[in-house]
């Protein structure tokens, strides 16, 4: 599957807020909405939109169905958030999206060699999405916000497609 990828624009893509149903809010922690999350990280010290922080929206059949926010930090890519449109959940699209994202340098301009993501232990559906995309459970991360599960993806290929 080749999705169409576009840069997230908070002014024209407010419809993404509607994807945050109660289930999504509880499993992502986006209590204040996606736009607030995006604007926080886009202005966070050390992050430069388009340089080491990106947010992309994936389209299928000319309709947006997923958004992914990620950054580059210490020689690895960190997925900060993935949100799939509610009616598209449970169909394997999240895993397919991640595989395409990880293996297509054209989406962000470079090949991802190592990628990490943290996930709430209660978010079993998301854990399966990442595992099906090739991520491996690595360790429990403990901090003041509670436990999270760290998953790691490492590219097995050095191609630059």
Question: Where do the protein language model's features map onto the residues?
Answer:
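Glycine-rich phosphate-binding loop
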Residues: 92
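Conserved active-site alpha-helix within GNAT-family acetyltransferase domains
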Residues: 95, 121-139
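Acetyl-CoA-dependent GNAT
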Residues: 7-14, 18-81, 85-87, 98, ...
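Conserved N-terminal entry element of GNAT/NAT acetyltransferase domains
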Residues: 1-14, 18, 154-161
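Active-site beta-strand termini and strand-to-loop segments that position acidic
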Residues: 59-61, 153-156
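Conserved catalytic-core motifs of GNAT/GCN5-like acyltransferases
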Residues: 116-118, 134-151
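Conserved beta-strand-loop-alpha-helix junction that forms the acyl-donor binding cleft
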Residues: 89, 115-127, 144-145
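Conserved GNAT acetyl-CoA-binding A-motif
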Residues: 105-119
